[in-house]
Amino acid sequence: MTLRIDHVGIAVRSLDERLGFWRDALGMTVAGTEDVPTEGVRVAFLPAGEARVELLQAL
């Protein structure tokens, strides 16, 4: 059986403050952002190979 990671979620205080690090220092791209009011978060999606990093900020 082959296991793979679909995504990794990382809680941040501010997406606006942290996205620069992920883009500029790590060279990742932001595929999109989304507010998810039912979960109380704003999420940014950053593809990482076959997986993705999800940065989550509380609303």
Where do the language-model regions lie?
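Core segments of cupin and vicinal oxygen chelate
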Residues: 2, 10-52
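Intrinsic, low-complexity N-terminal interaction/targeting segments
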Residues: 54-59
